[in-house]
Design a protein with these regions (language model features):
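Short, conserved active-site loop motifs that form the nucleotide-linked donor/cofactor pocket
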Residues: 10, 100-101, 168
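Conserved catalytic-core segment of nucleotide-activated headgroup transferases in glycan assembly
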Residues: 16-104
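Short, contiguous acidic/charged loop-to-helix segments that flank catalytic cores in large enzymes
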Residues: 49-54, 78-80, 125-128, 147-152, ...
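Hydrophobic/aromatic ligand-binding patch that stacks against planar heteroaromatic rings
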Residues: 65, 136, 160
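Single conserved hydrophobic/aromatic residue that forms the stacking wall/gate
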Residues: 188-196
Length: 196
């Protein structure tokens, strides 16, 4: 529908618009959550998007997710002190324990892909989706939860999920996004309890 807004000729590729390097390898050595300040017994939501993509609206949804999933934390890329302060202040105002938000420092791409394997579910941002960060998560074996917008920037993760056959993790709206996050967390934790 947005094609009329582009002066360039659009070339449609099968499955997804994004071309990725299939030769990138991820270290297969065992990784410990404690090395990254992560708890062993919690569901780990993550978002490694640049902080400007974390809008008040999407952060409010993440707060609701944390409230509905008591055995979870969220792991967010830390870009600067101001963004950390703002995210922590909102968490505090929402009466959620400080230890449920863990900041990740910037690492080399190779080391980042390695640590990403520790996350259980990547939470996408909206209206500007994850692009390379969503690809990185999927490449590391971490499913991405997104919801489909109307613009190119708000449909990137939808495109990537479709190419991976993860259509069930494309929500139609904010409520379904919240419900899916809670359901995935609950299902994962129940499976862990059963296998213990």
């Amino acid at each position: 529908d947005s094609e009329r807004f582009y002066s360039e000729k659009i070339i449609y590729m099968p499955d997804t618009y994004q071309v990725n390097d299939p030769t990138i390898k991820i270290d297969s050595q065992k990784i410990k959550k404690e090395n990254y300040g992560l708890p062993d017994n919690k569901f780990i939501f993550c978002s490694f998007n640049q902080n400007y993509k974390i809008t008040p609206s999407i952060y409010n949804i993440w707060i609701k997710i944390l409230k509905e999933t008591k055995d979870s934390i969220i792991w967010i890329l830390s870009e600067n002190n101001k963004s950390r302060e703002n995210l922590l202040e909102k968490l505090n105002l929402s009466q959620i324990d400080r230890d449920r938000l863990i900041f990740a420092e910037k690492l080399s791409h190779k080391d980042h892909l390695y640590r990403l394997k520790l996350a259980d579910l990547f939470l996408d941002t909206f209206p500007c989706n994850a692009h390379t960060t969503a690809s990185d998560a999927l490449r590391s074996g971490v499913p991405v939860l997104t919801y489909k917008g109307k613009t190119f920037a708000s449909r990137v993760a939808t495109s990537l999920n479709y190419s991976f056959g993860l259509n069930a993790l494309v929500a139609k709206d904010e409520k379904e996004y919240l419900d899916l996050a809670v359901a995935v967390s609950y299902t994962h934790l129940r499976a862990h309890e059963t296998n213990s």
